[in-house]
Amino acid sequence: DAARAPMHCFVIEPNVRQKATTYPQIQFEAGNRVFIEAGGCVQTGGHGKTWKRYVDPASDSDLYHGLIGLPGYVDRRLQGLVGTQVFVAEAGPLVLGYEDNNFGDNGYYARNSDNGTGNQCLGLGNAWVRLSIT
């Protein structure tokens, strides 16, 4: 319905301590259109500069990407969907995830002066996701 006002949903500091987290309070209906925005940074643990961008991390490995799961879009990297609108074909909850090989030391702690590899997190806050649903 073109007249339907968008519903805006925010997830501040999505869970990055496991592969996938379901957010049952954010439900989609068949036919929804979802505009996806996301940003910020995550503590990936380890040694040295360990904060990485949530959407498009600068890293020597193929890890540390934020993931999204919408009905019909399972474990997709946010990097390829931010700034786009997707069509939801079936009902279901939001699932957000994270790519890593050691989830136990991830989070949003010990930022201090750690702006990440190559200062990629300079001026950025903690990770977030915003969805506009119509």
Task: List each language-model region with its residue ranges.
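Gly-Asp-aromatic-enriched flexible segments
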Residues: 1-134
